[in-house]
Structure formats: structure tokens, C-alpha cells
Amino acid sequence: MAVDDTAGTLDREEGSTEAGGLEAEEVQARVGLSYTVTQIRRDPTALVGLAIIIVTTTVAIVATVDAVFLEYWLAETFWYHPLRGPHADTNLPPYGVSNQYYDASRTTLSHPLGTDFRGRDVAVRLFYGTRIAITVGFVSTTLGLVGGTLTGAVAGYYGGWIDDVLMRAVEILYAIPFLILVIAFVVAFDPDRKNALLFAMIGVGIASMPTFARLIRSRVFSVREEEYVEAAKAAGVKDRWIILRHVIPNSFAPVLVQATLQIGVAILIVAGLSFLGYGAQPPTASWGQMLNNARNLMLTNQWFSIFPGICIMITVIGFNMLGDGLRDAADPRIQN
């Protein structure tokens, strides 16, 4: 009887130890999240970046709802259709600005940023181009994040030949220049460029996988030795659940920072691809495509290239500012 009581006591102690380890893990995660949020709130640079992201994402959501579900009802009711024209004279400069074709008196507040070579309102096309930029940034980064995180986590957790095979493949991918890899992917899988934007997003996601894989792998090497991972193994939890529920969440902080920065990179890369003709195709309203349309007018009407360039710059800087703030908050050694 005494032996049974002793065994029961030991079982309860082991169970409480394991539960305590998992509870401590959860508490640590919550404390880390609370600390990060507090640091972000104290960082004006990160707050400015967050504000830019909120504004651009809101604009993208409104534009997407109108384009996909309302078939541009909002655009035609309150502004102009972003794909069809002409709405006014072609190549009209911004309000109050003159060029060699038009005097400033010909400009109008109805088209505050002017019109393009087809007479379409530039401001409206900039507004609806936001949805392409934000969609590209989030979708391509999510693809790279998921693929790279799973690859790096599996390689770091198992080690040995699995690590060697996976990381050699990652290094081969990493050795190919980013832009060349994406262009080659688009040309190989969509030579007619009917779905060039879709394949550009997938290509950017694949090209960004090595960055995430290498980053999380280095973290997994230390996390896999933690007590809560050993406790889960002793409890008979399968490896895939240990990786998904314990290893990845506790290795994710630097990956989240990199993902924020990668969104800005993806927006910039796909805008460049659209400019080169390997991204969004006419008449899609995208910032890169607008730069492509303006390439022959940079000497006579430079505004056509300045406005989409400013939109790209502000959006990319916003994600970079927030990413820098997250990095500073995630690494106490950087704090003053």
C-alpha cells in the first residue's frame, strides 16, 4: 500500500513538473509579448511605421472590396474607374502645374494629380494600386515564411543527414540572385505572362525561403535542448507536434522581425518586376505598372513617375521602421 502511495506521489510530481514547465513556457511567452508591445509603444519610429502600415492596409482593403465584390461601384460613384478612360485630357499635369502641353489654368481639382497617357485619373490609380502592393507583400512573405520556417525547424530539430540535405538545398537557392530567380520562375511557368503577378508573388516567396530557414534553424539548435521540449519527448508527444507547438513558437521572434522587413522587400521587388513587364500587366492599376507607363514621359511630365515612386518609398519605409522597432524590442542588448 505504501509503495502504491509512493508511486502515485511520484506520478503526480512528474505530472506537475511537466505541467509547470509548459505553464512556465506560456507565462514566458506572454511576458515577452507584453514587453515587446510596451517597447513598441515607447518607440516613435516604430509607431510611425505602424501608422503607415495601418493606413496603407486600410486603403488596400477598401480598394480590394470595391474591385472584387462591388465591381468598382465606389470608384465610379465617387471618383473614376481606375482601369477605363479617358476621364479628361491625356497627360494632364497635377493641379496648378504646367508643362509643355498644358498651361496651369487647364488643370483641375477633379484630377488633383493629373491624368496618364490614356486620360485615367492618376490619384485613383494610385489608390487602387495599393491593394496590389499590400497583397503582394503579405502573400509572398507568408509563402516564404511558412516554407522557410518549416524547412529550418525540421533541419534544426533533427540535425544529422536531414539537416545536411535540407540546408544544402537552401544554400543552392540562396546562391541564386533574388531578382534573376524570380524572373526565371515567371518566364518558366508563365511565358505568356497572363498570370505574371501571381507567379511573381510565388517566385518572391520561394526566393525568400532561405532567409527564414537559416534564421530559424540557428534558433532551433538552442530551443530543442530546453526542458519543456525534453518533457514533451518524455511524455511521448510526437515530433511534429513538438516542432509545431513548442519549437517554432519559441524560435519565432527573430523570424517575425525578418517577415516585417521582407514585406517591404517584396513590395519593392514586385514593383520592379511590374516595371520590367514581369509583374502586373496592363490595364491593372499597380505602382510598378504606372512607372512602366511613365518611362517615356520622364522628361516632359515627370510627375507620372514621381507619385508612384513616393507611394512605394513610403510603404517600404513604413515596414522597415516597424521591423527595426520590433528588432530593438526583441533584443534587449540593443536597448540604451
Question: Where in the sequence are the language-model features?
Answer:
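Short hydrophobic alpha-helical segments within the ABC transporter permease transmembrane module
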Residues: 125-127, 169, 216, 224, ...
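Transmembrane alpha-helices
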Residues: 131-147, 240-272, 319
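Non-cytoplasmic
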Residues: 180-184, 188, 201, 205, ...
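Short coil/turn motifs that cap or connect alpha-helices
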Residues: 150, 160-161, 238-239, 251, ...
